[in-house]
Each structure stands twice: as C-alpha cells, then as structure tokens.
C-alpha cells in the first residue's frame, strides 16, 4: 500500500471513475484537486465543495504543482500539458494503477479489441458459481477503486488499452489479450503502438493466456509472465474438438463441455469460452463453478443479442461491435437460411475497413450504411445503400424482408456521431425492430 497523506494529487476527469479516485485519495488524506476539460463535467454536482475544481481546460500550473497526476483514460499521455508535467518529474498514473497498489487479493485481468466484456462477465460468473465473492469492474461497470470497499476473494478486471498505458503494478494471477485488431487509430500512431499498450497486461503476471490464432497477443521479451497457455480452435492448450459433427470445449486432453450445452453461440463465443476457462483454471476456480457458468451465462446485452424475432425474421443487436474486428468476428462462420441485411456505420475512429470487403461481398449480403463513415463503408460492396440514419436504413429494408432473413446491426464503428452510447444505439435498433414487426 502507498502512503498518499499530504501529497498534492491532481485528478483529471470526473465521471464515475474520477469520483472514485477523489473518494479514494481523500480517504487517504491526500490534498486533491480536480481538472476536467469539459465546461460542465458529468459528476461535478457530486464532488465535495471543498475539493478545488478547474473546468474547461488543462490547468498547467496545477499540473506542475502536483506530486502525482491521476489521468483519465480518455486523455492521452501524449497531450502537451501532460508531457510538460512528466518532463518536470511529476508522476502520471491511472485509476487502475492506484487499485493495483492497494489490492490484496488475486486479480484476473482481461483486454483485447473484441470480446473482453463477455469474457470478463463469464469469468466473474464462474467465480461466483464456485462460491467466491468476486468484484468485477474496471472498463466495465464499477470503477476498480470502488471494488476495494468490498471484502472480495477475487477481482476480475476488464482493462482498455487506454487504462493499461498508465498501469505498471498489475501483477495479475492470470491475464489475457484476447485479440488485437485495429481500433482507436485516432489515438495511436499505428497498430503496433496500440498492441504494446495492450501487452502491458502481462507484466509480472503468473499466467499469460494468449490467442494461438493471433500472434499479436503473444507477449514480447519486455513482459515477464511466469507461464503461458494458449487457446485456439486447434493446436492449443484450450481447444475445440470436433467429433461426429459436434464440437466440444477441451482443456488439453480433458473434455469440459459440448458447445451445444453452453448458452453462448457462434465461433467467436466458443473462443471466448475457451479463454474464460483458461483464466478461471489458472486462478484456481473450481471446475464445478466453471461448468455451471458455461451452462447458464446468457451473454451480454448488445453483443450479438437476439433483439426480436417475428415472421421468420431474426433481428440481431450487435451494437457493441464498435470496430472492424468485432464485426468480422460476428460475420465469420455465420449461417442463415435467407438474406443478411447488415447495418454498418458510425464513427470509424480512423480504422481501415478493407478487411470487411471479402466478407460482405456475397450474393446473400445486403449492406445498409449510415452515419459519419457510412460513405466509406458503402464503397466496400456493390450491394450497399447509403443513408443518413439507421432509422432510414431500416425503413428501406423492412419491405424486402422474408422468412429466413436476418437483420444484423454490427456497425464496425463507434456510436457517438449520432448516439449517446453503443447501448443507446442498440436500444434504438431494438425499438425499430419491434416497431417494424408491429407495422
């Protein structure tokens, strides 16, 4: 544990995470000040009036007067004012680093371009089913520091590349980079810089769980995991066995469960299940808990979720597909009886969409593109139409639907150009799906 008493600490960014940092540091008797570049930041009304607050810009003087800066993951350490503070010898960390210095129980840490929320939630359910008190948080749900208020046996953290940039003391019992595909290219110089941020999760961990099908998830010499295990369809420690047309989840030579006994569907979710099993076993979670969770965990909202079905048409909400890799995962191995009506669009975050081209140029796939980067996506397929909004796209495709068709929202883009969040986008899709059937 670190002594923060009397230290001058500036927290950048309010919201749930920023407030959790303020609460933690004030309880440790630090002298806390808060900066938020928004003029009216979320959470300002919850901040104790005795805490100095500067809004609308980064206050360079406050930063230079600090012993430590706790930076919001949404702000890059490359920002000029932060670089000036670093050059002056000010320590810059994130909330996850504060958590790691304090946590006394084992941590399972999960990152990746796609699937990390599903795996985080599934591992959490495995631990709970085994009788453990599990704290789940980080980039999903509860801020990590808030988890310290409970007496948990195990922490399961979803971590973003942004959070990992300023995390140095993780020392996870088990950690994984599920996959690495282009995302946040408006923040990183290239894919390798993004990957290196992800790989920080392996520093000093006991077991690194790597994706045997994605060499970018393998630790470099810079990391120092005590041991490494892999998951993949074949030739891995955790793998899929096919026998008499059925697929089985395997841990080395031991059969865990048939894939048709788990609630998660699709090849990408079978990979997620293998990763979760590997992490859980590395952390000593009992097999009984692992099996129970696999049989009962239904998946997360907005992750390839059946939003509605009527007249033989399935409406599938995959609004969480905020990057190309996630949409590729949704489309790979997808089998439908009729036509696939694919909704694409939003803020592409500077990504290269070309990986989608081969997947969507099929006679049974029709693309309906919308939003900020809709025009770029529409160029990928000869069977594309361009719209301003998702609602306009759905109005157009509705009369063409026939039994056996699927309408899939898997946009390959962030939502913030037109929606408050990917959740709001998914909710609007679900509303329109049900309205579409009602009409």
UniProtKB/Swiss-Prot annotation:
Q: What is its biological role?
A: Cell wall formation. Catalyzes the addition of glutamate to the nucleotide precursor UDP-N-acetylmuramoyl-L-alanine (UMA).
What pathway does the UniProt record associate with this protein?
Cell wall biogenesis; peptidoglycan biosynthesis
Q: Which family does it belong to?
A: Belongs to the MurCDEF family.
Location in or out of the cell:
Cytoplasm
UniProt GO cellular component terms: cytoplasm
Output the Pfam families linked to this UniProt entry. Mur_ligase_C, Mur_ligase_M, MurD-like_N
Q: Which organism is it from?
A: Mannheimia succiniciproducens (strain KCTC 0769BP / MBEL55E)
What Enzyme Commission number(s) does the record list for this chain? Answer: 6.3.2.9
Write the protein's name.
Answer: UDP-N-acetylmuramoylalanine--D-glutamate ligase
GO terms for biological process? cell division; cell wall organization; peptidoglycan biosynthetic process; regulation of cell shape
Question: NCBIfam families in the record, alphabetically?
Answer: murD
């Amino acid at each position: 544990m670190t002594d923060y008493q009397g230290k001058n600490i500036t927290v950048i960014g309010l919201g749930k995470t920023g407030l959790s940092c303020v609460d933690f540091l004030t309880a440790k008797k630090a002298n806390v000040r808060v900066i938020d570049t928004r003029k009216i930041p979320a959470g300002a009304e919850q901040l104790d009036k005795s805490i100095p607050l500067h809004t609308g810009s980064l206050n360079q003087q406050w930063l230079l007067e600090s012993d430590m800066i706790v930076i919001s993951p949404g702000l890059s350490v490359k920002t000029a004012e932060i670089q000036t503070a670093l050059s002056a010898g000010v320590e810059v960390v994130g909330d996850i680093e504060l958590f790691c210095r304090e946590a006394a129980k084992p941590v399972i840490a999960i990152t990746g371009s796609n699937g990390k929320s599903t795996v985080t939630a599934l591992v959490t359910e495995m631990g709970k089913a085994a009788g453990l008190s599990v704290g789940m948080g980080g980039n999903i749900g509860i801020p990590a520091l808030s988890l310290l208020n409970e007496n948990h046996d195990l922490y399961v953290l979803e971590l973003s590349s942004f959070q990992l940039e300023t995390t140095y003391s993780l020392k996870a019992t088990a950690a994984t980079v599920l996959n690495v595909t282009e995302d946040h290219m408006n923040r990183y110089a290239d894919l390798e810089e993004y990957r290196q941020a992800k790989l920080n999760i392996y520093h000093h961990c006991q077991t690194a769980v790597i994706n045997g099908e994605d060499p970018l998830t393998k630790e470099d010499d810079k990391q120092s995991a005590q041991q490494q295990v892999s998951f993949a369809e074949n030739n891995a420690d955790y793998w899929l066995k096919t026998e008499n047309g059925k697929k089985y989840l395997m841990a080395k030579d031991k059969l865990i469960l048939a894939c048709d006994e788990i609630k998660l569907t699709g090849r990408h979710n079978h990979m997620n299940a293998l990763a979760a099993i590997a992490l859980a076993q590395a952390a000593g979670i009992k097999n009984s808990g692992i099996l129970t969770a696999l049989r009962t965990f239904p998946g997360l909202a907005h992750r390839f979720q059946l939003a509605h079905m009527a007249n033989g048409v399935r409406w599938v909400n995959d609004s969480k597909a905020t990057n190309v890799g996630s949409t590729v995962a949704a489309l790979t191995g997808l089998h439908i009886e009729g036509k696939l009506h694919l909704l694409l669009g939003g803020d592409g975050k500077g990504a290269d969409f070309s990986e989608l081209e081969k997947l969507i140029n099929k006679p049974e796939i029709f693309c309906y593109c919308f939003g900020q980067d809709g025009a770029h996506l529409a160029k990928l397929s000869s069977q594309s139409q361009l719209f301003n909004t998702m609602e306009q796209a759905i109005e157009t495709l509705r009369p063409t639907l026939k039994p056996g068709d699927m309408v899939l929202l898997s946009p390959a883009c962030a939502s913030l150009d037109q929606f408050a969040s990917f959740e709001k986008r998914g909710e609007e899709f679900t509303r329109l799906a049900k309205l579409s059937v009602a009409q």
